[in-house]
């Protein structure tokens, strides 16, 4: 599914970045800052103003509140946001996800979100091992995960994603297997499982540079293989490098029914309006990034202006290259007809050499209808993506 947009049609996908966290995790390179009541109130004022500026160009079928920690917003702050969205006719999305930290999910807040149309929760679990949670700087305990999950179910959420991480320093295969087993036993509809990435300017990266631990690529590969096998045995369908979902309907459908439609829109090159500090959207061939500074973001919106840091007009070929790269993260790869409908380019003509390079590496398969990565190729999807990008275009 691709929620494409033209200058005359409304954008059907909305992302909102809530930049506040109770504490910065050791691995996190996303823009966030410590929560502060007054600053959070100013942010809500600015966000509502930004919504007002773009509402006429929006008819969202998917909404995603990410962060940061959106669940940190107070009940009063959430009510203000939800009331504004109702006034601006932004409610009623087919899929509306809110990211939550298990330490910040109250029964009252869960009910409020569900009553206003939020129908999908993504909970940042990362691990169910207390030692690793401390290692990552997470503020929640394993017990909070189970209690928050039950609260969400009681509030009526029947589509819950659990975020997990593997190849964490100090994580053994036994710990990883135990975490997967417990997470699956909870009965969630979706799993997002990411290998730890060592981003510059994060504590974990500095610890790696200082020699406090080593990275074992063989262990990471083994954990990824174990993830795929374990998820499959439990009835999850892998539909993207790091994402697994259950079927609620036709078991032979190309995509599982609980696949995240908002993210699929990204991977399929669809338009997305992005609001909040540091948020990056894609509309009418332009990549639009907001200022990664909450104070400046709020100040700009107080003047009635969008808080853009940059607006980059992509050439058709550059846009198609990015779309090719992102779309190959999905297990179904790119059907040639769909790629041409989406981008206007023939994948077989413009990327023939790149596809052959992937096939020769045993990382990809090319049929008459589509090009997709193999199981081994999915492990190296980021490397493959670099071959398909056309930055000089």
Protein language model annotation of sequence segments:
Residues 3-13, 32-54, 58-345:
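C-terminal scaffold of the Radical SAM
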Residues 17-32:
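Local cysteine-cluster metal-coordination motifs and their immediate loop/turn environment
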Residues 376-393:
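Short, amphipathic alpha-helical interaction segments positioned at domain boundaries
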């Amino acid at each position: 599914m691709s929620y494409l947009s033209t200058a005359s049609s409304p954008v059907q996908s909305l992302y909102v970045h809530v930049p506040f966290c109770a504490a910065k995790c050791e691995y996190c390179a996303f823009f966030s800052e410590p929560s502060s009541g007054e600053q959070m109130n100013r942010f809500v004022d600015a966000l509502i103003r930004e919504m007002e500026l773009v509402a006429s160009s929006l008819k969202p079928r998917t909404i995603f509140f990410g962060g940061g920690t959106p669940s940190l917003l107070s009940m009063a702050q959430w009510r203000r946001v939800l009331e504004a969205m109702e006034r601006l006719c932004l409610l009623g999305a087919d899929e509306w996800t809110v990211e939550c930290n298990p330490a910040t999910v109250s029964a009252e807040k869960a009910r409020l979100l569900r009553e206003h149309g939020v129908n999908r929760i993504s909970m940042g679990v990362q691990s169910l091992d207390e030692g690793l949670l401390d290692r990552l700087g997470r503020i929640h305990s394993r017990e909070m995960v189970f209690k928050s999950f039950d609260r969400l179910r009681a509030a009526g959420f029947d589509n819950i994603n659990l975020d997990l991480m593997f190849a964490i320093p100090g994580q053994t295969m036994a710990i990883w297997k135990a975490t997967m087993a417990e997470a699956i036993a909870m009965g969630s509809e979706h799993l997002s499982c990411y290998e730890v990435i060592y981003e510059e300017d994060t504590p974990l990266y500095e610890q790696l540079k200082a020699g406090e631990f080593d990275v074992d690529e063989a262990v990471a590969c083994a954990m990824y293989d174990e993830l795929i096998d374990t998820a499959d045995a439990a009835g999850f369908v892998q539909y993207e490098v790091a994402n697994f979902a259950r079927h609620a309907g036709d078991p032979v459908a190309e995509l599982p029914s609980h696949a995240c439609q908002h993210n699929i829109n990204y991977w399929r090159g669809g338009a997305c309006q992005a609001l909040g500090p540091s948020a990056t959207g894609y509309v009418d061939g332009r990549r639009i990034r907001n200022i990664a500074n909450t104070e400046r973001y709020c100040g700009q919106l107080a003047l009635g202006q969008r808080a853009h840091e940059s607006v980059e007009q992509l050439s058709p070929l550059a846009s198609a290259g990015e779309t090719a790269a992102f779309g190959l993260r999905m297990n179904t790869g790119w059907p040639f007809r769909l790629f041409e409908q989406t981008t206007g380019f023939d994948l077989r003509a413009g990327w023939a050499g790149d596809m052959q390079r992937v096939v020769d590496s045993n990382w990809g398969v090319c049929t008459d209808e589509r090009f997709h990565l193999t199981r081994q190729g999915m492990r190296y999807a980021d490397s493959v993506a670099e071959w398909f990008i056309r930055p000089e275009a």
